[in-house]
Amino acid sequence: MATLLFDDGREATAAEIEAIARAHRIVVEHRPVPAALAETLARPLLDDTAAATVLDALPPRPEFPSRDLIVLHPERPDNEQLATKFENWHRHAGDEIRHILDGAGIFGVIVDGQRADLHVGPGDFIVVPAGLEHNFRLTAARRIKAVRYLSDAEGWSAEFTGRAA
């Protein structure tokens, strides 16, 4: 289940996470990863066939007609380049929706002027609403597999804010 840590090291309670999420229109839910995907998700990298298998095992969401699977792993040649890109603070015109299937990551958000880190792992489903400044960082393991949902193609474009990572 997702955890929220503030810059001062304090961990938010479940009630605080719910209140903060509601106030900032962030959705944080737990949606179990289908057990049938365990063997496929255990692979470090996935080819197109394996990625399609993963996507086919998850129910489509009509409100998000487009989706793909992002796989970051140390064995991926451009892993650090992609990870660094996501670390830059940015916002989107559309919602950023992720369902974490394997690995872990950290969504940084600004909550009432204070930076907070939302740690996500397998089964966590998060929606960062359009316009909310955020970033994303990998954990020390440097790996994650997540479905990215999109309601419109323009939503993928990031507007970088220049805030220091």
From Swiss-Prot:
Positions that bind Ni(2+): H90, H92, E96, H134
Reactions it catalyzes: 1,2-dihydroxy-5-(methylsulfanyl)pent-1-en-3-one + O2 = 3-(methylsulfanyl)propanoate + CO + formate + 2 H(+); 1,2-dihydroxy-5-(methylsulfanyl)pent-1-en-3-one + O2 = 4-methylsulfanyl-2-oxobutanoate + formate + 2 H(+)
Cofactor note: Binds 1 Fe(2+) cation per monomer. Binds 1 nickel ion per monomer.
Pathway: Amino-acid biosynthesis; L-methionine biosynthesis via salvage pathway; L-methionine from S-methyl-5-thio-alpha-D-ribose 1-phosphate: step 5/6
EC numbers for this chain: 1.13.11.54, 1.13.11.53
Catalytic class of the enzyme: oxidoreductase
Residues reported to bind Fe(2+): H90, H92, E96, H134
Entry-linked Pfam families: ARD
Keyword Hydrolase in annotation: no
Site description May play a role in transmitting local conformational changes, residues in chain: D95
Cofactor: Fe(2+); Ni(2+)
Keyword Amino-acid biosynthesis: yes
Keyword terms, alphabetized: Amino-acid biosynthesis, Dioxygenase, Iron, Metal-binding, Methionine biosynthesis, Nickel, Oxidoreductase
Any one GO MF annotation of this record: acireductone dioxygenase (Ni2+-requiring) activity
Annotated site location: Important to generate the dianion: R98
Function text: Catalyzes 2 different reactions between oxygen and the acireductone 1,2-dihydroxy-3-keto-5-methylthiopentene (DHK-MTPene) depending upon the metal bound in the active site. Fe-containing acireductone dioxygenase (Fe-ARD) produces formate and 2-keto-4-methylthiobutyrate (KMTB), the alpha-ketoacid precursor of methionine in the methionine recycle pathway. Ni-containing acireductone dioxygenase (Ni-ARD) produces methylthiopropionate, carbon monoxide and formate, and does not lie on the methionine recycle pathway.
PANTHER family noted in UniProt: ACIREDUCTONE DIOXYGENASE
Family: Belongs to the acireductone dioxygenase (ARD) family.
Subunit record text: Monomer.
HAMAP family linked: Salvage_MtnD
Name of the protein described by the UniProt record: Acireductone dioxygenase
Organism: Rhodopseudomonas palustris (strain TIE-1)
